Amino acid sequence: MKTIIALSYIFCLVFAQDLPGNDNSTATLCLGHHAVPNGTLVKTITNDQIEVTNATELVQSSSTGKICDNPHRILDGINCTLIDALLGDPHCDGFQNEKWDLFVERSKAFSNCYPYDVPDYASLRSLVASSGTLEFINEGFNWTGVTQNGGSRACKRGPDNGFFSRLNWLYKSGSTYPVQNVTMPNNDNSDKLYIWGVHHPSTDKEQTDLYVQASGKVTVSTKRSQQTVIPNVGSRPWVRGLSSRVSIYWTIVKPGDILVINSNGNLIAPRGYFKMRTGKSSIMRSDAPIGTCSSECITPNGSIPNDKPFQNVNKITYGACPKYVKQNTLKLATGMRNVPEKQTRGIFGAIAGFIENGWEGMIDGWYGFRHQNSEGTGQAADLKSTQAAIDQINGKLNRVIEKTNEKFHQIEKEFSEVEGRIQDLEKYVEDTKIDLWSYNAELLVALENQHTIDLTDSEMNKLFEKTRRQLRENAEDMGNGCFKIYHKCDNACIGSIRNGTYDHDVYRDEALNNRFQIKGVELKSGYKDWILWISFAISCFLLCVVLLGFIMWACQKGNIRCNICI
């Protein structure tokens, strides 16, 4: 009996395939868009996480691990700091007259000469680094009545006591140290950088032994500036066997100006000047090795590609670099909203449009058509709407780079002026710049992502409206991105709808006739499917009852024998 009921149910399902609407006089056309099984989450103005078919990472988060030697000229400081190379520390003599785009200072660098300090070390370091050269020109200063070329055991040059090669230590000659008053005009067309110093003896005896006077004084002047330094005699921590010190100063002499040096002792005199050049040279502290490669952007961690607008490798950079932001990732949508395709579409494999889900496997376009007609099913991309979306999305990455560079360069220039005037605010300003860059970057990417999603949705709607205008009353909008076409529409007919050559008048009469022709139960209400399935269920139930009644009647008449065993 159970077998008979099951066969009856299957019989009903088989006949259900001949429901009204599945005959050859109608067709279904659905519009849809590309989808992928696993999309990428991006952020928009209205949504923190929205899935798209494709996205591009905008933040460079790793370096090559080495500093590329091309296209920038890299000068490896090895064991020397830039200031030691500038002064002429004996172990840095190999850097004399060198040039660079980027001077790389190493953590292992050390000084190996007379202990010194620079009152404004960072400014001098930055000044020389930006000049990009250690080119030095000797000048004939006229020092009279004193002994020149003083040296120290703390600054060996070979086996002999020495001193910084770019400086001239003056001390008494015999028992006198006459006042020195020397001038040196700048008749060149470029600025001259003079490095000079003041010696601070550790004891009063050392002071008089070297300079006779109990207290010396050094004054260096130009038409624009004057510096006066009085030595501080006193013991300091021992460095390389000495408790005395040298303080290093510098003076820039403009073209047409004149350098005046006046001293009655303790003067560490210049031997000449360094040529000052304007350019984009710089300095960086890094222990990354220098390798044979090419990269426009260098960080202390190593070189990084500059094909992304942002990076979070290091806030210190040199060259054409992405802007530093706090975010580890910022994804730019380069595809449409992703709605993965449902894997099952009911018993009979119905097709659905873009309102329900996207379509996977559309490799030849972003938008397209699927149809179901008397010749079967098929799918084709709509290249025109696809190209319209791609044309507007192409170049989006370049537009983001342009926008960020323009905005951030303005901020950078503005804050650079503040940093130069107010040293106490330097760290605060740097943090503020990074906060602004990070906020602007996130906002800009969210705006672009919102535009991309709105754009791709708009192209889908345009294609749907274009199809609706072609079909008019020949088809019915099914509400899921599909149209039910009320006339026979073979593959050629479907193709004419796709390419925009469909003639609605040709099929108008047939479509109207089919719309109003009653075939079984053809209801327009939203309860159509429910009523159809209920009617089939009742029919199947009645069939089962009839069969069961026949079997019971046959058993009573003796035509069928039924044995029940326990």
Curated annotation (Swiss-Prot):
Location within or outside the cell: Virion membrane; Host apical cell membrane
Topology term for the membrane: Single-pass type I membrane protein
Domain of life: Viruses
Biological processes annotated in GO: clathrin-dependent endocytosis of virus by host cell; fusion of virus membrane with host endosome membrane; fusion of virus membrane with host plasma membrane; viral budding from plasma membrane; virion attachment to host cell
Protein name: Hemagglutinin
Taxonomic lineage: Viruses, Riboviria, Orthornavirae, Negarnaviricota, Polyploviricotina
Name of a matching Pfam family: Hemagglutinin
The organism of origin for this protein: Influenza A virus (strain A/Memphis/110/1976 H3N2)
Sites where a glycan is attached: 24, 38, 54, 79, 142, 181, 301, 499
Membrane spanning stretches: 531-551
Additional comment: Major glycoprotein, comprises over 80% of the envelope proteins present in virus particle.
GO molecular function: host cell surface receptor binding
Main localization, broad class: virion
